[in-house]
């Protein structure tokens, strides 16, 4: 119920604003409604190409999650690799991207690579908003 209502409100906001800024949240609502393929459709839409870099990262994280929902861990990894994976990035969106990538690698059984990317996530998350260090200890 709530996902459906949220999606309707987001669609209305998108119509009023005329821009793509709500795509990542809309895609996440589609996932919440059990429609991961719709989330991926939104990530592939023409509007998605208009997003700023940070919003593209958020949409890629959602699309990767949708691929994982469908059992496609390798597809999730590839989805995240479409973003700027430069280790020198320092914004919180980089920490979230690196974390999502590390998590997908861990699920795929690629533990050494997962450790490397959880470390990178922790390095650009000085406020420890994410649990990257704890995930490192678990691996």
Residue ranges and their predicted role:
Residues 16, 49, 78-84, 109-130, ...:
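TPR/TPR-like (Sel1-like) alpha-helical repeat modules
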